[in-house]
Swiss-Prot record:
Disulfide bonds: none annotated. HAMAP family: INFV_NCAP. Residues 1-74 are annotated as: Disordered. GO terms for molecular function: RNA binding; structural molecule activity. The gene is NP. Keywords: Capsid protein, Helical capsid protein, Host nucleus, Host-virus interaction, Ribonucleoprotein, RNA-binding, Viral nucleoprotein, Viral penetration into host nucleus, Virion, Virus entry into host cell. GO terms for biological process: symbiont entry into host cell; viral penetration into host nucleus. Belongs to the influenza viruses nucleoprotein family. Its main location: virion. This is Nucleoprotein.
C-alpha cells in the first residue's frame, strides 16, 4: 500500500525543458467562420433564478434588462469574491467535520465530499422528489430514509511514526444547516458558486472516464468523444453549463428527446416538453460554427413530428463537428480546498479570471494531495488532476506537454483510476501523494474551435477540442472522418445534407497544413503581463489524443 513521508513529499522533478520534449511547426491560415448569434425575443438565454431549473421568471428578466452591465474589472472582482467565499465555506465544513489538520484540508477527496454535500443540500427539487418516493416506499413496507440529511466520506489523517495515512469516516449533515451556512457565507443564494462546482465535477468526469455507452445508446460512434464535453453536467447548471457542453452532448440530448417523442406521440403537445426540446435545439444552433451546420439544425427545428430522419440529421451534424468544431467554453476550476488556501498562499489580488493568468498562478501555488487507490501511480494521478482542473480531456496532449514540461500519456497508458474511491476500496490506512505537475508556461483559454486548419491525428478519439489559445496545428484523424462521410444523403433535406458533407470534404482537402490561433503565444508562468511571448513547440512523437482506443472505466459503470 502506498505511503508518504511526513518530512518531505517526493513530488518528482522535471528533467527536460519544453524545448527538449517538443519541436515546432507552422503554416498557412484560413479565417475563422464566426458563429452567428441566434437570439429570438422569446428565447433569450438568461441566468437561472434557482439551481433546480433552467427557467427564468418574467420578473427576473425585467430585472436583468434594467441592470447595468458589469465591466470586465467588476466581473473579475466578483469572481474573486466568489472563489474566496467558496474557500471560507469549505473551512467551515471542515471545522464541523472535525478535520482541522492542513493535510486533511488539502485532500482532494475531502474537497469533493464537501462539494457533493453542498450540491445535494441545495437541490430542493431532488429532495422533494426523494421524500415523495420514500413516502410511497414506506407504504409498501420498505425502510424509511431521512432525506433532510445528506452525508459523504471524508478522510482523517493517521500518523504512524514518520508516515501518514488516511482513514475513511462517514459524516452526515442536515441539508438545511448546510444551505444556511452556504448562503450566509456567500451573502446570497450563490448560484454561480454552485454552477462553478458542477462544472468542476463534470470536467473531472470527462478526464477520468470514457462515455462509450452513452454515445452508443444514442447511435453515435465512440470516436466522437471529443464533442461530448460536459455530458455529466446536471440540467440545473443552466446557461453556464450549456456554454461548457460540447456539440455532441447537445446532439445526444436532442436524440434522447426525439426517442421519447417517438414512443409517446403526445409528448410534444405538452407545452413544457415542447419548450424544453426547442431550447435544446436553439442551444445547439448557437454552438454551430458553420452556416451549413445551422441549416441542418433549422431542418430539425422545422420538423412537425420528429423521428428517424431527424436523428439521422443530428448524427451527421455530430460527425461534422469533429471537422468544423463548435464553440465550447473552457475555464479553470480548482477544488474548493485550494480556494480555502488563498489567504495563506499570499495570493494578493482582488481580481480573478477563470480563463486567464490568476487561475493558473493559483494552481501553481497550491499543494493538493490525493488518496492513492490500489495500483495508482502518483505522477499519472497528477496528470489526471491537471487535466481535470483545466477541462483538458479533449485538448491536444502535445500542447499540454509543452506548457508543463511533462510528457503526457494516453488515458489507457496511465496507471491510475479516478479520484472517487468506491465504498469497497475504502480501507484503513490509505496512502496519498502530492499532485506534482505544474505549469512552466501559461496561455489564455479559448472558446473557439480553432477552425482555421486541421492536421493529421491518430485513431480511437479522432479530433481535439482546443482549450488553450496558442498557435498550433489542430489534430484530426482524416481517415476516420472520411469513413464517416460515406453515408446516404437522400431524403427531404438532401440539399442541406449535401452542403454539409461538401463543407466537410472541402475542409478535409484544404486544411491539411498550417496552424490555428495564428499569432497566439505562450508565456513564462512568471510573465503575468505577457511581455515576452514564446512560440509553442510541438513534438509529433507525443500522442495527440488522450482517449485513443481506450480501456478506461466507463462513467456508467461507476458504483457510488
Amino acid at each position: 500500500m502506498s505511503n508518504m513521508d511526513i518530512d518531505g513529499i517526493n513530488t518528482g522533478t522535471i528533467d527536460k525543458t519544453p524545448e527538449e520534449i517538443t519541436s515546432g511547426t507552422s503554416g498557412a491560415t484560413r479565417p475563422i467562420i464566426k458563429p452567428a448569434t441566434l437570439a429570438p425575443p422569446s428565447n433569450k438565454r438568461t441566468r437561472n433564478p434557482s439551481p433546480e431549473r433552467a427557467a427564468t421568471s418574467s420578473e427576473a428578466d425585467v430585472g436583468r434588462r434594467t441592470q447595468k452591465k458589469q465591466t470586465p474589472t467588476e466581473i473579475k472582482k466578483s469572481v474573486y469574491n466568489m472563489v474566496v467565499k467558496l474557500g471560507e465555506f469549505y473551512n467551515q465544513m471542515m471545522v464541523k467535520a472535525g478535520l482541522n489538520d492542513d493535510m486533511e484540508r488539502n485532500l482532494i477527496q475531502n474537497a469533493h465530499a464537501a462539494e457533493r454535500i453542498l450540491l445535494a443540500a441545495t437541490d430542493d427539487k431532488k429532495t422533494e422528489f426523494q421524500k415523495k418516493k420514500n413516502a410511497r416506499d414506506v407504504k409498501e413496507g420498505k425502510e424509511e430514509i431521512d432525506h433532510n440529511k445528506t452525508g459523504g466520506t471524508f478522510y482523517k489523517m493517521v500518523r504512524d511514526d514518520k508516515t501518514i495515512y488516511f482513514s475513511p469516516i462517514r459524516i452526515t449533515f442536515l441539508k438545511e444547516e448546510v444551505k444556511t451556512m452556504y448562503k450566509t457565507t456567500m451573502g446570497s443564494d450563490g448560484f454561480s458558486g454552485l454552477n462553478h462546482i458542477m462544472i468542476g465535477h463534470s470536467q473531472m468526469n470527462d478526464v477520468c472516464f470514457q462515455r462509450s455507452k452513452a454515445l452508443k445508446r444514442v447511435g453515435l460512434d465512440p470516436s466522437l468523444i471529443s464533442t461530448f464535453a460536459g455530458s455529466t453536467l446536471p440540467r440545473r447548471s443552466g446557461a453556464t453549463g450549456v456554454a461548457i457542453k460540447g456539440g455532441g452532448t447537445l446532439v445526444a440530448e436532442a436524440i434522447r428527446f426525439i426517442g421519447r417523442a417517438m414512443a409517446d406521440r403526445g409528448l410534444l403537445r405538452d407545452i413544457r416538453a415542447k419548450t424544453a426540446y426547442e431550447k435544446i435545439l436553439l442551444n445547439l444552433k448557437n454552438k454551430c460554427s458553420a452556416p451549413q451546420q445551422k441549416a441542418l439544425v433549422d431542418q430539425v427545428i422545422g420538423s412537425r413530428n420528429p423521428g428517424i430522419a431527424d436523428i439521422e440529421d443530428l448524427t451527421l451534424l455530430a460527425r461534422s463537428m469533429v471537422v468544423v468544431r463548435p464553440s465550447v467554453a473552457s475555464k479553470v476550476v480548482l477544488p474548493i480546498s485550494i480556494n480555502a488556501k488563498i489567504p495563506q498562499l499570499g495570493f494578493n489580488v482582488e481580481e480573478y479570471s477563470m480563463v486567464g493568468y490568476e487561475a493558473m498562478a493559483l494552481y501553481n501555488m497550491a499543494t493538493p494531495v490525493s488518496i492513492l487507490r490500489m495500483g495508482d501511480d502518483a505522477k499519472d494521478k497528477s496528470q489526471l488532476f491537471f487535466m481535470s482542473c483545466f477541462g483538458a480531456a479533449y485538448e491536444d496532449q502535445r500542447v499540454l506537454s509543452a506548457l508543463t514540461g511533462t510528457e503526457f500519456k494516453h488515458r489507457s497508458a496511465l496507471k491510475c483510476k479516478g479520484f472517487h474511491v468506491p465504498a469497497k476500496e475504502q480501507v484503513e490506512g490509505m496512502g496519498a501523494a502530492l499532485m506534482s505537475i505544474k505549469l512552466q508556461f501559461w496561455a489564455p483559454m479559448t472558446r473557439s474551435g480553432g477552425n482555421e486548419v486541421g492536421g493529421d491525428g491518430g485513431s480511437g478519439q479522432i479530433s481535439c477540442s482546443p482549450v488553450f489559445a496558442v498557435e498550433r496545428p489542430i489534430a484530426l484523424s482524416k481517415q476516420a472522418v472520411r469513413r464517416m462521410l460515406s453515408m446516404n444523403i437522400e431524403g427531404r433535406d438532401a440539399d442541406v445534407k449535401g452542403n454539409l458533407l461538401k463543407m466537410m470534404n472541402d475542409s478535409m482537402t484544404k486544411k491539411t497544413n498550417g496552424n490555428a490561433f495564428i499569432g497566439k503565444k505562450m508565456f513564462q508562468i512568471s510573465d503575468k503581463n505577457k511581455t515576452n511571448p514564446i512560440e509553442i513547440p510541438i513534438k509529433q512523437t507525443i500522442p495527440n489524443f488522450f482517449f485513443g482506443r481506450d480501456t478506461a472505466e466507463d462513467y456508467d459503470d461507476l458504483d457510488y
